[in-house]
């Protein structure tokens, strides 16, 4: 399969990362979780006591980060950060750092450079509208806030993180608001993206639906 790029956008907890990951494996193309990149920046910023408003320090931090992927795991400066970036403290702060214009500009540039070198499936908040505007395949994956909160709660409990449903739902709704209302590249469905509500479908059913659309071409 030559010269293919697939953009998958949607709110937190909709299942887009899991879906994109499986599609990448099925089609044998590179999967890039752009959310992991923002999470990694958030992790490193918190470790270095850099606030979201400290633009110059954030830019210097990002420029010092050598970001790559090993399978589905994000590697920064040679260290696997996949587990660290899934901690609740990152969930609670990532939208603040992701809303910073200069952060988005630097990471979008990295993402676009990757897409020029490889066939990719990327998931995030602004893939179809900004990062891969010309992607031939665009999908917007969503689900109700309650369904997404249940999924996130299950995921966190499986990792041994003890948290209640009400707190997870609150976090999901707060992230939705921040992601949809930020000034720079807000979460929104691209006009040419296919909308898929996953509330009543399994991951496998959604993957099959997307793969069938791609294979028809």
Swiss-Prot record:
Pfam families linked to this entry: Cytidylate_kin
GO molecular function, one term: ATP binding
Keyword Transport attached: no
Gene3D superfamilies, alphabetized: P-loop containing nucleotide triphosphate hydrolases (3.40.50.300)
Major location (coarse): cytoplasm
Localization per Swiss-Prot or TrEMBL: Cytoplasm
InterPro entries, per the entry: Cytidylate_kin, Cytidylate_kinase_dom, P-loop_NTPase
Record field: transmembrane: none
Protein name: Cytidylate kinase
Organism expressing this protein natively: Clostridium botulinum (strain Okra / Type B1)
Phylogenetic classification of the source organism: Bacteria, Bacillati, Bacillota, Clostridia, Eubacteriales
Gene for this chain: cmk
């Amino acid at each position: 399969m030559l010269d293919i790029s697939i953009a998958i956008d949607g709110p937190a907890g909709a299942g887009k990362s899991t879906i994109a990951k499986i599609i990448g494996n099925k089609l044998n193309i590179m999967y890039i979780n752009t959310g992991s990149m923002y999470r990694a920046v958030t992790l490193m910023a918190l470790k270095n006591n850099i606030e979201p408003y400290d633009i110059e320090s954030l830019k210097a931090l990002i420029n010092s980060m050598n970001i790559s992927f090993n399978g589905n795991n994000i590697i920064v400066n040679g260290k696997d950060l996949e587990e660290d970036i899934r901690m609740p403290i990152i969930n609670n702060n990532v939208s603040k750092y992701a809303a910073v214009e200069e952060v988005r500009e630097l990471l979008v540039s990295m993402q676009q450079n990757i897409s020029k070198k490889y066939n990719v499936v990327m998931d995030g908040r602004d893939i179809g509208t900004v990062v891969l505007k010309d992607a031939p395949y665009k999908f917007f994956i969503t689900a109700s806030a309650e369904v997404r909160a249940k999924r996130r709660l299950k995921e966190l409990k499986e990792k041994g993180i003890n948290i209640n449903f009400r707190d997870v739902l609150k976090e999901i709704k707060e992230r939705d608001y921040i992601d949809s209302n930020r000034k720079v590249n807000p979460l929104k469905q691209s006009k040419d993206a296919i909308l898929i509500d996953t509330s009543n479908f399994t991951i496998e059913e959604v993957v099959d639906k997307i793969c069938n659309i791609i294979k028809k071409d």
